[in-house]
């Protein structure tokens, strides 16, 4: 057990109940599930809860299109969502729906407390009304040009381009997303949450460490713009909860959606009487509450939600963790390219553990977008999980079963075991801080050491000699013990594999038992645990995704790239021989993560005419990069220098090893190359902006 048991409640954002889960959604649930499983592995009391977000005009309209009741539609979607999550080994302690009695009571309770405390204001407003459909239009059902940055095709409540929030009446050239008609103005009585009253509290909370630095900085911009009262009302017809004492008026979906965290936990408490709702949500609670969300809903979770809780007498979350978007093959998910992949389509073709590992290997605590490069995905899974991890057991377990009665030897030389155990605190810290990519690199570095040990010892040669039987027993037992430690470290990421390994070892894999002595312990016969990723299956998944997905919202329009004009003077010689490339938009450039790196070590690469192997320190992390600069630099000239590297370039498998990025250099090539060197004061890991 952990030395000091924590009480933790963790949530993922609620998926909307009008469509299927896709691989963009899965990033968040896998990220949260890994963190929750890690906490439980350490012996903490951790409850992972979620629910379907089941209210709003989109659900009402879609149910009408299908000719069924909204209740029937959301029940079917809930069933599909839960099955997808279960098949991806996402282990919720409770999965519920915002369309529940628990949530209705919680929403009413919070609203009435806010009202009684003076935080609900009522006023008549002019709102956009669809004259063709005879309905007031929710913010997300009005589209037009952003009043702040002038980006076209933006929703009526916030701009995806600049992040600004505004009233739908501020949109330029608004159109109804329901009928396409130009909306007209109509008066209606609405209730507003007095968000500006909480500005002081929110400024203190957002700078308390509850948010990532990037999020807190973004909120400062919103504070500078001034907080606005928040409209929490929608008019009938609407699918949701009616506001107490206000017939025909309904709670806006974003009021009762986050309350769904509380409603789901209420539901769990009813199933498990030993749990106390107030112990986790009461104002004086000492339990921990964490929300994992996407960066697109930061405003709601970091301003409205903590203010609502504070104003109604409940506790605020300890932290809100945001992540970036998922791209596929370097671009926005696309139906036409087959890269907008439903969770179920993936499951029809590939093992969910593959994606869990790949996402973990690329996740950090930052809000950067994550690219699912399908070629790199197959290569990394095959190299790390099949070639390194499972191969460690498959190469040695058979000898234990066939030659040593299935029993492990007492390991005489524990040097490797001690080295592996010495990494547990480092790996634990990475899991806790959501630096999963760093944890995976640490674990795979250990796997390389273990495989090198087996390759050097070659037990398959030892067993051919009578006088080396005990040595072979030692090597294979040592290798399997290292394998057990590695899989225990990976248990939060690969729960199904961990389960198979527990059956193989015939004992549970627990963090507290990492150093367990297995001398004389009997193992089960080894069975295949993981197959290689076959590219034909990846291609089949992409092909299926071209046919069976709903049309998604159009991407923001960008200007077509144009060729830059020729250099005006022949004296600009580099531009003549190497013209400037086509223009790209800022978003494409922003995807490149440039970092200051110190060249710790440089060395020649055997049988390579142009390459040097560089070990780069990027601030607490070391990367290996093969650079084609051998003709311009000798290794000793480079060591200790600072340079600039592309840090988020997908790792590339070369015949000399894995290259984990790219250093930047200028010049035509050969001996005429100059690496970029920043001025004094730059430090490894700094972002180049």
Swiss-Prot record:
Cofactor note: Binds 1 zinc ion per subunit.
Primary location recorded for the protein, binned into one broad class: cytoplasm
Catalytic reaction annotation: tRNA(Met) + L-methionine + ATP = L-methionyl-tRNA(Met) + AMP + diphosphate
One GO MF term attached to the UniProt entry: tRNA binding
Alphabetized SUPFAM superfamilies for the sequence: Anticodon-binding domain of a subclass of class I aminoacyl-tRNA synthetases, Methionyl-tRNA synthetase (MetRS), Zn-domain, Nucleic acid-binding proteins, Nucleotidylyl transferase
Gene Ontology CC, one term: cytosol
InterPro entries: aa-tRNA-synth_I_CS (IPR001412), Anticodon_Met (IPR041872), Met-tRNA-synth_bsu_C (IPR004495), Met-tRNA_ligase_1 (IPR023458), Met-tRNA_synth (IPR014758), Methionyl/Leucyl_tRNA_Synth (IPR015413), MetRS_core (IPR033911), MetRS_Zn (IPR029038)
PROSITE patterns: AA_TRNA_LIGASE_I, TRBD
UniProt motif 'HIGH' region: location: 15-25
GO BP terms: methionyl-tRNA aminoacylation
Gene3D superfamilies in UniProt: HUPs, Isoleucyl-tRNA Synthetase, Domain 1, Methionyl-tRNA synthetase, Zn-domain, Nucleic acid-binding proteins
E.C. number(s) listed in UniProt: 6.1.1.10
Positions of short motif 'KMSKS' region: 332-336
tRNA-binding domain sequence ranges: 588-689
Binding sites annotated in the UniProt record for Zn(2+): 146, 149, 159, 162
UniProt-annotated location(s): Cytoplasm
Family note: Belongs to the class-I aminoacyl-tRNA synthetase family. MetG type 1 subfamily.
NCBIfam families found in the cross-reference section: metG (TIGR00398), metG_C_term (TIGR00399), PRK00133.1 (NF001100)
Protein name: Methionine--tRNA ligase
């Amino acid at each position: 057990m952990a030395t000091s048991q924590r009480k933790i409640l963790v949530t993922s954002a609620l998926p909307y109940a009008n469509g299927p889960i896709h691989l963009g959604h899965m990033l968040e649930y896998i990220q949260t599930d890994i963190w929750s499983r890690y906490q439980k592995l350490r012996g903490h009391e951790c409850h992972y809860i979620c629910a379907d977000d089941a209210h709003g005009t989109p659900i009402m309209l879609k149910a009408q299109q299908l000719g069924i009741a909204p209740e029937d539609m959301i029940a079917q979607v809930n069933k599909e969502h839960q099955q997808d999550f279960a098949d991806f080994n996402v282990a919720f302690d409770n999965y519920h729906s915002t369309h529940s009695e628990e949530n209705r009571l919680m929403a009413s309770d919070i609203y009435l407390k806010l009202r009684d405390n003076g935080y609900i204001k009522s006023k008549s407003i002019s709102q956009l009304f669809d004259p063709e459909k005879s309905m007031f239009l929710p913010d997300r059902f009005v589209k037009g040009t952003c009043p702040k940055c002038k980006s076209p095709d933006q929703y009526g409540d916030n701009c995806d381009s600049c992040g600004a929030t505004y009233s739908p009446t501020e949109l330029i050239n608004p159109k109804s997303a329901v009928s396409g008609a130009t909306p007209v103005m109509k008066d209606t009585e609405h209730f507003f949450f007095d968000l500006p009253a909480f500005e002081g509290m929110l400024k203190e909370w957002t700078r308390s460490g509850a948010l990532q630095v990037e999020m807190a900085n973004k909120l400062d911009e919103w504070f500078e713009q001034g907080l606005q009262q928040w409209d929490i009302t929608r008019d009938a017809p609407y699918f949701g909860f009616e506001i107490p004492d206000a017939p025909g008026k309904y709670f806006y979906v974003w009021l009762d959606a986050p309350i769904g965290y509380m409603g789901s936990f209420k539901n769990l408490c009813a199933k498990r009487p030993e749990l106390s709702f107030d112990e986790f949500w009461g104002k004086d609670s000492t339990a921990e509450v964490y929300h994992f969300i996407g960066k697109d809903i930061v405003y709601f979770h970091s301003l409205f939600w903590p203010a609502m809780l504070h104003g109604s007498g409940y506790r605020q979350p300890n932290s809100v963790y945001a992540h970036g978007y998922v791209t596929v093959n370097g671009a926005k998910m696309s139906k036409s390219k087959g890269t907008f992949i439903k969770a179920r389509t993936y499951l029809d073709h590939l093992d969910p553990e593959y994606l869990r590992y790949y996402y973990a290997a690329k996740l950090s605590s930052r809000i950067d977008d994550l690219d699912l490069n399908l070629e790199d995905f197959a290569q990394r899974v095959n190299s790390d999980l099949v070639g390194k991890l499972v191969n460690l057991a498959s190469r040695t377990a058979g000898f234990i079963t066939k030659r040593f009665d299935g029993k492990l030897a007492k390991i005489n030389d524990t040097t490797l075991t001690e080295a592996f155990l010495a990494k547990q605190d480092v790996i634990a810290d990475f899991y806790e801080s959501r630096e999963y990519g760093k944890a995976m690199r640490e674990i795979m570095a250990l796997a390389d050491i273990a495989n090198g040990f087996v390759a050097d010892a070659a037990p398959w040669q030892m067993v051919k000699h009578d006088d080396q039987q005990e040595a072979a027993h030692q090597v294979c037992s040592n290798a399997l013990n290292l394998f057990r430690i590695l899989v225990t470290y990976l248990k939060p990421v690969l729960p199904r594999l961990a389960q198979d390994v527990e059956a193989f070892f015939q004992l549970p894999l627990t963090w507290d038992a990492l150093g367990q002595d297995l001398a004389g312990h009997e193992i089960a016969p080894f069975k295949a645990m993981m197959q290689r990723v076959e590219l034909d299956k990846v291609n089949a998944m992409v092909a299926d995704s071209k046919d069976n997905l709903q049309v998604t919202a159009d991407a923001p329009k960008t200007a077509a790239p144009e060729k830059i004009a020729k250099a005006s003077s022949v004296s600009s010689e580099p531009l003549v021989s190497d013209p400037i490339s086509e223009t790209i938009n800022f978003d494409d450039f922003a995807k490149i993560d440039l970092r200051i790196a110190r060249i710790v070590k440089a060395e020649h690469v055997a049988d390579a005419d142009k390459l040097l192997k560089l070990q780069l320190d990027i601030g607490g992390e070391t990367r290996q990069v093969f650079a084609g600069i051998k003709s311009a630099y000798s290794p000793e000239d480079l060591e200790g220098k600072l340079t600039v590297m592309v840090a988020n370039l997908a790792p590339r498998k070369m015949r000399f090893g894995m290259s984990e990025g790219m250093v930047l250099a200028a010049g035509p090539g050969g001996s005429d190359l100059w690496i970029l060197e920043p001025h004094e004061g730059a430090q490894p890991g700094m972002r180049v902006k």
